[in-house]
Amino acid sequence: MEKKRVYTFGNGQAEGKADMRNLLGGKGANLAEMNLIGVPVPPGFTITTEVCNEYFEKGKEAVVALLKDDVEKSIKGVEALMKSKFGDVENPLLVSVRSGARASMPGMMDTILNLGLNDEVVEGLARKTNNPRFAWDSYRRFVQMYGDVVLGMKPVNKEDIDPFEAIIEEVKKAKGVRLDNELDVDDLKTLVVRFKEAVKKQTGQEFPSCAYEQLWGAICAVFDSWMNERAILYRKMEGIPAEWGTAVNVQAMVFGNMGETSATGVCFSRDAATGEDLFNGEYLINAQGEDVVAGIRTPQQITKIGSQRWAELQGISEAERVAKYPSMEEAMPEIYKELDELQTKLENHYHDMQDMEFTVQEGKLWFLQTRNSKRTGAAMVRIAMEMLHQGMIDEKTALMRCEPNKLDELLHPVFDKEELSRARVLTRGLPASPGAACGRIVFFAEDAAEWHTNGHRVVLVRIETSPEDLAGMQAAEGILTARGGMTSHAAVVARGMGKCCVSGAGAINVDYKTRTVEIDGVVLKEGDYISINGTNGYVYAGEIPTQPAKLSGNFAELMELCDKYARLKVRTNADTPRNAQDARGFGAVGIGLCRTEHMFFDDEKIVAMREMILAKDVEGRKKALDKLLPYQKADFKEIFKTMDGLPVNVRLLDPPLHEFVPHDLKGQEEMAQAMGVTVDYIRQRVESLCEHNPMLGHRGCRLGNTYPEITEMQTRAILGAACELKKEGYDPHPEIMVPLIGILYEFEAQEKVIRETAAKLFKEEGVEIPFKVGTMIEVPRAALTADRIASHAEYFSFGTNDLTQMTFGYSRDDIASFLPVYLEKKILKVDPFQVLDQNGVGQLIEMAVAKGRSVRPELKCGICGEHGGEPMSVKFCHKVGLDYVSCSPFRVPIARLAAAQAAIEE
């Protein structure tokens, strides 16, 4: 039986439903579902995501042939429901053609409206509606969209504006008007003629007049847009597989531009920036939907309270607001009432915040789509917790509703209050996406990406953003636009990325050609600093320092919920008391990796460290180590104090010694003077330490076994600090970790030094501290012989950075030279240093845990590489039975949520 490729919907019936989003895409599944629950939706049909894959496998002609009969039959069904005919001159049916992947990708793919118009049909539409201006406005919009999306009419240079917009500006200038809606029917006819001439001149193609030719061109263009540059980039950012494909939705047009009783808009059942349980959105009277989301006109608010808040931000009086910018609630009260009832119905049906598009055609409300809304990290947490309290979802759903990586946004910095009080306010726009950002002004997306690569923080300043700006938005610290509302492309995408954004700052005048922006008489050029606050919409001159954000009660409640369900504990990687304090505040239950080498780089300590490394003999080394001991002990004491009552896993010295010595002549001269030796001696010693492959050389336990006096000093520092704190009434829990072992005897030799040193120290101090000695499993041989190692080691900590490096044979420092090619060619799906390789490295971990526990059933196992804060890797660690993961302090909340989700998914 031939598989079904086209699914129809309309008039309260549908062949699809909500749970078919993998096949129909999010939009197609929701259009079907809305029909089934009684929401007014224009009829249409969905071509499945599977066809998208067929399109790229078999080619355009083969797929058009496969679809032809089903599409033509479905069009006839829509004609019957709408009582009109596709391509008919007297009673025309017009359709929209939209993309719809299973995961929301706002603005990344293409849309075409008003399809089916030509020079004859437009006259019939004018007669049918008795509204020539509406008909010709619809036609010029169609030619503009089709020319862009299907025929490839783009600006030639990045400084140029859209070629169609350039023609519109010329016609408006000749007419002496400022706004598009001041153009009359003759002007619109002129635009259509000039648009078609421009298409022929730039593309060499005549604009198609046959309705079905237009339709097939649009369907294929939507499939093609799945592989456009911005869609590919967005998928990489969001982790969306290319094989998912996009569906194509063909739907009868309803018109928001048929006069003053028509409108179009976008609305949200809750606030997408803050999560406040407040219906909100924007609409435009006598407009089409793309006008709202494209940010071409700054729209009005749907609710009265939203309108009043907007007016306050813009400095508009209440009297002026009511007269010029009334809300839909005030201007169209009956439509507003129906819209409010239906948005509540949809949120209650989907049990999640909804992002909805609608059109009002001559007083009748139609819904064009609904989807689970994109939201900021702060909104995500608040909505999950409030829906839990409102009884809409249960605890597990609340946890699964939150994306671990988006928690990172809640930890975003805010402007320093003191510095802010002295800052100069330039203007205020709409607070489209919260956070604080400062950086150098750039005007073009490619420049933002280039400046970011060169180490500059940038703010992307645009008249309005488009999907082509995605790479620049990703590279920027924040985005500032002159046009567009809270539902414009810039706002929606910035919120999805967790980027700070101020939109619709009407007082700014952007000049792309001179690369300047003028704000209330102040001219700023490319490269000047600017600061923006996406939480309240303020724009400031210059660079304002930031400080850490304060976390909400909802965040704390979410974290408590995580701990209720998670089995896997979360520790932190911390080398300073400040790091440890941050991590403890985020809920870390210990330190999983304290790197001792980072403590040696202060001016005084590095001199003593270098003396130890460059010493001629054991006596010289011990003399230098005696200088280092009090420094190390003081450092450990502060960390143990901060983590009082919690385990602190200290890794003995790991890096190759050449990393600590001076390689420049000035540094070598200073070192020679400090040690009372010749510069030649220092240079020769430094050269003798250099290795061809230092990451596999004289480092880790190999240092401790070659120079046991180093291990002895570090053991005295760690346990000496613990003894002093014990006497002061603290409760330290030290763990000493031997790095880079591959052979049991390497561990045994180090353990012997540690235990003998501890016994002497405890006798001297008159106090004994319980402590553990464990090892880092980062050499594949250690994983393969884990049962033998566990006979001595009291715990395992998997160093997944080095374990990945040695398992793949990739140098972590050099992988950047070929990784982009490997990812592009799909040789690798992800960077294995970012996401744990479960099939190779993961198998070594799983094997080592099983072997280790076969000898020592109570063996504690964790990981301490950067993978410890990556959600997919955390879930793998849960699956293989690790006791904890350890990650950098600001990744602790992410790991806690991922651990809870892993337990729920089990």
Model-derived regions: residue spans:
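A short, small-residue-rich loop immediately preceding and capping a beta-strand
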Residues: 477-483, 501, 862
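Extended, non-globular alpha-helical segments
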Residues: 428-468, 519-557
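Conserved alpha/beta-domain cores
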Residues: 98-99, 551-554, 561-906
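Nucleotide/phosphate-binding sheet-loop regions of phosphoryl- and nucleotidyl-transfer enzymes
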Residues: 1-423, 431, 450, 456-459, ...
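Short beta->alpha connector loops at strand-helix junctions that form conserved
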Residues: 45, 482-484, 503-506, 594, ...
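Structural motif
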Residues: 249, 442, 459-461, 480, ...
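Short mixed-charge
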Residues: 76-88, 517-520, 759-768
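Glycine-rich phosphate/ribose-binding loops and adjacent secondary-structure elements
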Residues: 364-366, 459, 466-474, 486-493, ...
